[in-house]
Amino acid sequence: MTVVPENFVPGLDGVVAFTTEIAEPDKDGGALRYRGVDIEDLVSQRVTFGDVWALLVDGNFGSGLPPAEPFPLPIHSGDVRVDVQAGLAMLAPIWGYAPLLDIDDATARQQLARASVMALSYVAQSARGIYQPAVPQRIIDECSTVTARFMTRWQGEPDPRHIEAIDAYWVSAAEHGMNASTFTARVIASTGADVAAALSGAIGAMSGPLHGGAPARVLPMLDEVERAGDARSVVKGILDRGEKLMGFGHRVYRAEDPRARVLRAAAERLGAPRYEVAVAVEQAALSELRERRPDRAIETNVEFWAAVVLDFARVPANMMPAMFTCGRTAGWCAHILEQKRLGKLVRPSAIYVGPGPRSPESVDGWERVLTTA
């Protein structure tokens, strides 16, 4: 049996797997830049998600996302994540997507753009459900941005402020380095699989509550503060019970999560009704955390203000992970292309720590094997 090195850390924590030109989370400075451009500049200047997709994938604003094709969602399971994951995987046989190994970069880019807008369309169709009539395509075609088309396909007549809120959220969520779902997308892409398989696999990774479900878990805390009227007592109660304070702390940033800063400003600018209670909770939480853990810098993370912005845009809690998926398609596509160009299979190793050599007779249950043979 191999001896485990003393400095071994499971889960690839701290291991550098790739170099990338796509995004730079500045952990010490509290900034996030897409190909060198700060997300605060993108959101404050109302750059739409479709254009940010192009920035991440192409490195310029030349050619954003095209409109989604009027293609019906092929499955309605009642779960938005399942619907979009299955729908994307089915694009490969429907549209004849070849393996990444067998196509050039331009074709891969075109397929990724086509699949990305279909992911947005599938989320909107799934959320609207089968008990409401579909929004006529001619109305969707009148929309000027990909985000407006998404909101119209889902809600019919969305509030323009809600469209702006979703744009701000998607731009903030579009890319964040080597997280679990992005790594999954790159691993699948490294095998030469088709783009739909890589995107579908990334959605599967994001379905885990440790990655994509945190914004929805902030809302009950805001609800409780609105009922109690005392943010500090609610926060103290959560911490006294040993529960996790949702929306605070991040594995990457030592300073404030820049995405939280961007979305806080968006919530204030758009007049989100829960902005004031969210500010009260944030201030109470930060004060309490600093008193209890003066040796640790625990700041607000993106999930806290994402919950406020998404709630303002009338996104139900069970749909929030799917909205994260929509935004992150941009980063996934950029990394899939980057991995294709790298052309190297991702194949880490593992240290075996199981039993040493032994006979089958020495394994518990061998007698039952004999009786059924």
UniProtKB/Swiss-Prot annotation:
Which catalysed reactions does the entry list for this protein? Answer: oxaloacetate + acetyl-CoA + H2O = citrate + CoA + H(+)
Classification via Gene3D superfamilies = Citrate Synthase, domain 1, Cytochrome P450-Terp, domain 2
N-acetylthreonine modification, residue list: 2
Pathway noted in the entry: Carbohydrate metabolism; tricarboxylic acid cycle; isocitrate from oxaloacetate: step 1/2
Active site residues per record: 250, 303
Cross-referenced CDD domains, in alphabetical order? BsCS-I_like
| GO cellular component labels | cytosol
The record's similarity note reads:
Belongs to the citrate synthase family.
Instruction: Supply the PANTHER family for this chain.
Output: CITRATE SYNTHASE, CITRATE SYNTHASE 2-RELATED
Miscellaneous note of the record: Citrate synthase is found in nearly all cells capable of oxidative metabolism.
Q: How is this protein named in the record?
A: Putative citrate synthase 2
